[in-house]
Curated annotation (Swiss-Prot):
Gene Ontology molecular function, alphabetical: amino acid binding; aspartate carbamoyltransferase activity
UniProt superkingdom: Bacteria
Protein name as annotated: Aspartate carbamoyltransferase catalytic subunit
Gene3D superfamilies tied to this protein: Aspartate/ornithine carbamoyltransferase
EC numbers: 2.1.3.2
Pathway: Pyrimidine metabolism; UMP biosynthesis via de novo pathway; (S)-dihydroorotate from bicarbonate: step 2/3
Enzyme class (EC, first level): transferase
Organism (species): Akkermansia muciniphila (strain ATCC BAA-835 / DSM 22959 / JCM 33894 / BCRC 81048 / CCUG 64013 / CIP 107961 / Muc)
Listed SUPFAM superfamilies: Aspartate/ornithine carbamoyltransferase
């Protein structure tokens, strides 16, 4: 990157050059995984704090492993056992972060925009690991990196995103980045979960038959986010699976057409996807996990915290 970037808060703030730098750098990072020593001293002496206000296993662990492989010191800030539960305000938390003089803060919060607030008031580099239903930039980067591995030229490739678009920060960030890289994106899901006011220009389908006729290259499944739904948006998990899930019957067609399957995790087996599909040779879910570490290493490596006095 020609100009130092302090934070990664969303995809829209990245230039095309920055996007390609982050994706291109993830390749050499991934090559480290095959070495006997999987660490480099790039961030030796730097401190990384994970600040998660929502439960997370995959994203948090991925960032922690990424930081450790760059030789950074990692501190896990567990909100349930922290002062936040005792009434500490966001302003107090920010002041604490400044006093601790950490170099990087990985933050996930249930309120959209909170990572931006922290970034404005701290010298640390802030990475948005998911804020409400707004953005999840590192997931978007790892998804596009994964697709680039199976399609060296992603331009014109078609990605069908299936499920709860309305509540999904993954759908917002991932669809935006895919379109910027020249991919075509379409949505499939219940009308109640596919917003019509957003994502202008993206085709919407109501059933898999329509979607298959669009000739997708990748089926990207989203988790049904019951915790973000104030009221039920579909009758039952069983009904959802029947209409929008990758069932064994649909897997036959997916396999026959050589389509790839992706999912940001965690997976609801029997809802979005059947057990058999998890073992399908073109299921990229485990590769997404591996690539998440490489992409997050690239993100941390390319961010530049402000000097603290």
């Amino acid at each position: 990157m020609n100009h130092p970037r302090k934070d990664l808060l969303n995809i829209s703030s990245l230039t095309d050059e920055e996007i390609h730098t982050l994706l291109d750098s993830a390749g050499p990072m991934k090559e480290l995984f095959t070495k006997s020593v999987k660490k480099v001293p790039a961030l030796k002496g730097k401190s990384v704090l994970t600040l998660f206000y929502e439960p997370s296993t995959r994203t948090r662990s991925s960032f922690e492993v990424a930081a450790e492989r760059l030789s950074a010191d990692v501190t896990n800030f567990t909100v349930s056992t922290s002062s936040v539960v005792k009434g500490e305000s966001v302003q107090d938390t920010i002041a604490t972060l400044q006093a601790m003089k950490v170099d990087y803060v990985i933050v996930r919060h249930y309120n959209s925009g909170l990572p931006n607030v922290i970034a404005r008031h701290t010298c640390a580099s802030v990475v948005n690991a998911g804020d409400g239903a707004h953005a999840h930039p590192s997931q978007a980067l790892l998804d596009s990196f994964t697709i680039r591995e199976v399609f060296p030229d992603v331009r014109g490739k078609r990605v069908l995103i299936v499920g709860d678009i309305l509540h999904s920060r993954v759908a917002r960030s991932t669809s935006l980045l895919m379109k910027r890289l020249g991919m075509e994106v379409a949505f499939l899901g219940p009308g109640s979960l596919v917003p019509r006011t957003e994502h202008s220009g993206i085709p919407r389908f109501s059933d898999f038959n329509e979607a298959f006729a669009w000739k997708p290259d990748v089926i990207y499944l989203l988790r049904v986010q019951k915790e973000r739904q104030d009221a039920p948006f579909f009758p039952s998990a069983r009904e959802y699976n029947k209409i929008y899930g990758v069932t064994e019957e649909r897997l036959k067609r997916i396999s026959g057409e050589g389509l790839y399957i992706m999912h940001p995790g965690p997976v609801n087996r029997g809802v979005e996807i059947c057990d058999l599909a998890m073992d399908y040779e073109r299921c990229l879910i485990n590769r997404q996990v591996e690539n998440g570490i490489a992409c997050r290493m690239s993100i941390l490596y390319h961010l530049t915290p402000q000097t603290q006095h």
